[in-house]
């Protein structure tokens, strides 16, 4: 988002086929109230939004703290576990508790905060809001099988049942991102993966 954008800009973007905003907070708009107005316009025209969460990442970015995230009210709390520089855990807990929006845990983030976030979301009975991403390509590169590695991390160290961690990566993410996959439903695009339980 850039300063000076008005409602008609979002209408024009939607008419041109734009359906996703880049991360709120990486452009010139960083204040919560200003971002909230633009996020509302985007939502009005069917454009989904994600907000940067945590410390600066690219040149021109800055700290986006819990208060800005809550005020902006984007559809997805992007990389809640940071791009390695996560918010303090008590702030992550506040975001889980005070927002009703999707919570994105990423592979290229702080692993400890990612694990704790998944546990906290389960305690709050809001695991349906957890989605997974890689946050790549980023400064830490592109991780092959990053989503699978994140599923394994949450299932092994996060006390998340494996089938639930897979749901974060597939159905939850598809629902929040508006993807035509990730759920087994009539009319959806599907790949079939046959799995067996681990042998011990």
Positions of the model-derived regions?
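Short glycine-/small-residue-rich flexible loop motifs, especially phosphate/cofactor-binding loops
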Residues: 10, 39, 66, 93, ...
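Active-site charged/polar residues at nucleotide-handling catalytic sites that mediate phosphoryl
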Residues: 16
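Metal-cofactor-binding active-site regions of metalloenzymes
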Residues: 1-5
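Generic non-transmembrane alpha-helix signal with a bias for helix starts/N-cap capping motifs
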Residues: 6, 35, 62, 89, ...
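His/Asp/Glu-enriched, well-ordered alpha-helical/loop segment
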Residues: 119-197
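Phosphate/diphosphate-binding glycine-rich loops and adjacent basic-rich segments that engage nucleotide
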Residues: 13
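Active-site core of metal-dependent hydrolases
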Residues: 20-141, 158
């Amino acid at each position: 988002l850039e300063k000076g954008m008005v409602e008609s800009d979002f209408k024009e973007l939607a008419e041109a086929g734009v359906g996703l905003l880049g991360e709120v907070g990486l452009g010139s708009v960083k204040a919560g109230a200003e971002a909230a107005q633009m996020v509302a316009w985007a939502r009005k025209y069917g454009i989904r939004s994600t907000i940067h969460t945590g410390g600066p990442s690219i040149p021109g970015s800055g700290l986006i703290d819990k208060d800005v995230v809550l005020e902006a009210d984007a559809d997805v709390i992007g990389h809640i576990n940071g791009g390695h520089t996560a918010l303090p855990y008590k702030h992550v807990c506040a975001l889980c508790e005070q927002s009703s929006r999707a919570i994105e845990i990423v592979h290229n983030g702080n692993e400890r905060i990612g694990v704790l976030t998944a546990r906290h979301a389960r305690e709050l009975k809001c695991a349906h809001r957890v989605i997974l991403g890689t946050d790549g390509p980023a400064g830490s590169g592109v991780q092959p099988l990053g989503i699978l590695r994140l599923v394994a991390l949450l299932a092994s160290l996060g006390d998340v049942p494996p089938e639930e961690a897979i749901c974060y990566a597939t159905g939850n993410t598809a629902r929040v991102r508006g993807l035509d996959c990730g759920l087994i439903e009539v009319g959806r695009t599907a790949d079939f993966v046959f799995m067996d339980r681990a042998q011990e």
